[in-house]
């Protein structure tokens, strides 16, 4: 772990921090491309082949039955079900307000009406990771905004748990009102959603995080379908000053570090003394933490850097973190200068896990500095905004000279004539 003043970071150290473990998919593109081509050509037969190869099971029917969903409720703790239901309510409420703040509008000027309307995509596919662990919270985060946006058909794909679906994933899908759940994962699931098979419908957009093969597949099918954004290892930047609580900072650091050996955790702090206290607390907490094998690897991707609050803000904006915690004396004042972040957590009582599960905001967020150009998953992800225009003859006359002049300048004489014929 680097512990150093921002002003003293050399070019290599700064590059390690800013260009953290970005997902390099070039080496697996031929393999993923072959999988996608096979799924496109052979449909369900290809899916069965890859499920046997990668998951070690034979599945004839990928769609989860109503009976299987009903049984799933009996297989998980009732408190987990209750927590999923409560989390769903918060997530749904947040995204409903988000949807209400999307506006259709129209201007009316001299015989020209021009505006924008809002329409959802027709079908959405939500990929939910599996493998080492299953993530029912990701079901809520992907399905809920799609349903709120008005998507007619929202389906979930997730790797099988043996020959069945993971019970918590099935329950979460039912709570979020998914229209279909399929026991299929990996690049082959992305291919099924992009091209459609006999059993799995083709969708218009694919959302949700996944491993490097899923990320590569999403990039390759983009254009055939829309996607949310590329996803990489999870990351957090925690901004601190003298007022910050070292215990809270250390625990939030470990909460991120336990995600993945490639997770990145950066702490910016305004004093060297505070930086040392935070480092000591982190090392102390690691001794009794769970998932230490993962934490000890991800800590190699981490740093504590010291600088003025302005230097810390500048570094944060360059880093563009997936999660940004501002644990300073006046977090809302710092917020005014933040340009790039996936989701922002203010003050001592807003750790990243609340956004991961229950505050209502979405946890599917851009990583690897993609927050410079992407927002997190939202109802807008599933929305199209067609523009509309209606002109009177007087309105057309008022702009006809502009249209005909520019059309003819570009050599598009029939464009010009289409206007002139209406005015003759």
Curated annotation (Swiss-Prot):
The active site is at residues 322-323. CDD domains: Histidinol_dh. Binds 1 zinc ion per subunit. This is Histidinol dehydrogenase. One of its GO terms (biological process) is L-histidine biosynthetic process. It comes from Methanococcus maripaludis (strain DSM 14266 / JCM 13030 / NBRC 101832 / S2 / LL). Its cofactor is Zn(2+). Its EC number is 1.1.1.23. InterPro entries: Ald_DH/histidinol_DH, Histidinol_DH_CS, Histidinol_DH_monofunct, Hstdl_DH. Catalyzes the sequential NAD-dependent oxidations of L-histidinol to L-histidinaldehyde and then to L-histidine. Coiled coil: none annotated. GO terms for cellular component: cytoplasm. It comes from the Archaea. It holds the Pfam family Histidinol_dh. The keyword Ubl conjugation does not apply. Belongs to the histidinol dehydrogenase family. Keywords: Amino-acid biosynthesis, Histidine biosynthesis, Metal-binding, NAD, Oxidoreductase, Zinc. Pathway: Amino-acid biosynthesis; L-histidine biosynthesis; L-histidine from 5-phospho-alpha-D-ribose 1-diphosphate: step 9/9. HAMAP family: HisD. GO terms for molecular function: histidinol dehydrogenase activity; NAD binding; zinc ion binding. It catalyses: L-histidinol + 2 NAD(+) + H2O = L-histidine + 2 NADH + 3 H(+). NAD(+) binds at residues 127, 188, 211. Gene3D superfamilies: 1.20.5.1300, Nitrogenase molybdenum iron protein domain.
